[in-house]
Regions:
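Conserved, mostly hydrophobic/aromatic
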Residues: 82, 144, 211-213, 248, ...
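Boundary/entry segment of secreted carbohydrate-active catalytic domains
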Residues: 6-91, 321
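Solvent-exposed loop/turn segments at secondary-structure junctions
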Residues: 57-58, 87-90, 113-117, 148-153, ...
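N-terminal carbohydrate-binding/catalytic regions of secreted carbohydrate-active enzymes
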Residues: 49-138, 263, 269-274, 283, ...
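Aromatic-lined carbohydrate-recognition surfaces of secreted/lumenal glycan-active proteins
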Residues: 51-55, 173-198, 243-254, 279-285
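Active-site cleft segment of glycoside hydrolase catalytic domains centered on the general acid/base Glu
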Residues: 126-212, 216-232, 259, 289-307
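C-terminal motif of bacterial Sec signal peptides marking the signal peptidase cleavage site
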Residues: 2-4
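Glycoside hydrolase catalytic-domain groove-lining segments
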Residues: 95-105, 110-112, 215-255
Length: 321
């Protein structure tokens, strides 16, 4: 009887998942050397640009300048690329945009275009033309991520389908062409999860429509090496004659300081091994309302920030010096 009473407690427990290997040699998958037809925003001949989205305390001119300036001061260098998010109706060329451009930095514009079918019905032509002219006026080459992460399930109501997204992409790009915009490199940027599911390629507009391929990749809900998280994307992108930008990457606070530092060191090695990756941008933000597995800011985490600092100071990521 005594042994029977304890039976439930003595059942073998499932083994914990193995710890991720963050110290092995990363796989070299996307290794094309170019030269690439990448549009006006040209990739470096060797190495990669480095950048970030830095969430300001206030979404104002002063707030944006302060956020970027504070991070760059801590890093001891200017970032090559600044990721900036715009709603459909928000035009490029703000005061802070102009200030960053005057400092010699480049913009990656993440533009949240709206419902694809309403775009195709011509409901937003005036707005699209206004954005095209605004980008043309800044003259400097920019990276434009038209409705990045279009493959997310929670965007399906406005994306409708891969075919609708592709048609809207071509429609918007044609308006830019008719407005004589010649300083945009078109960046197609789904999620790493979309490649794991297998549906992200359904949204690809085609090699003749895209200048840079891109992916957003996070160690958020699960702690895996970046090479594993984006391997399906890299295998796909290796077959495209395009440079790659890692549009957003991050490792969540939930995984602890030492693990975050190891993950970032592994990310640096992975970027170097896959030399088709020509730009990377960290997501330096703790979005409001998110739990620890969706908070990615490195500032304030000494070990993790030190690992990122090592990445941005490495000669491989200082191609404009």
């Amino acid at each position: 009887m005594l042994s029977g009473c304890g039976g439930d407690d003595e059942r073998p427990q499932p083994a914990p998942p193995p710890a991720p290997d963050l110290f092995g040699r990363p796989r070299a998958i996307a290794v094309q050397d170019g030269p690439f037809a990448a549009g006006p925003f040209t990739p470096p001949a060797r190495g990669a640009y480095v950048g970030a989205w830095i969430k300001p305390d206030e979404l104002t001119h002063v707030g944006r300048l302060a956020a970027v300036g504070s991070l760059e001061s801590s890093l001891g260098r200017r970032l090559d690329i600044l990721n900036t998010y715009r709603r459909f109706e928000q035009l490029v060329g703000t005061e802070s945009d102009q200030e960053f451009l005057a400092q010699g930095q480049s913009l990656m514009i993440s533009w949240a275009t709206g419902d694809n079918r309403s775009i195709l019905d011509g409901e937003h032509d005036r707005l699209i033309r206004a954005q095209a002219r605004a980008i043309r006026r800044i003259k400097r080459p920019v990276l434009l991520r038209m409705r990045w992460e279009m493959d997310r399930p929670n965007l399906r109501a406005t994306m409708w389908s891969g075919a609708d997204y592709i048609a809207a992409w071509k429609y918007v790009r044609d308006i830019f062409r008719r407005e004589h915009v010649e300083n945009v490199s078109w960046v197609w940027c789904p999620t790493a999860e979309g490649f794991m599911r297998g549906d992200a390629p359904d949204f690809y507009p085609g090699d003749d429509q895209v200048d840079w391929t891109c992916v957003d990749v996070y160690a958020g809900a699960s702690f895996q090496p970046i090479g594993e998280l984006m391997e399906p994307f890299l295998r796909w992108a290796a077959q495209r004659p395009k440079p790659i930008v890692i549009g957003e990457f991050g490792v969540a606070k939930a995984w602890g300081s030492a693990n975050r530092a190891a993950w970032l060191r592994d990310a640096e090695r992975t970027f170097k091994a896959n030399r088709q990756i020509k730009a990377v941008a960290y997501f330096e933000s703790d979005p409001e309302g998110n739990g620890p597995n969706q908070q990615f800011q490195l500032s304030g985490d000494e070990a993790a920030f030190k690992a990122f600092h090592s990445l941005v100071k490495d000669p491989y990521f200082n191609v404009t010096d």
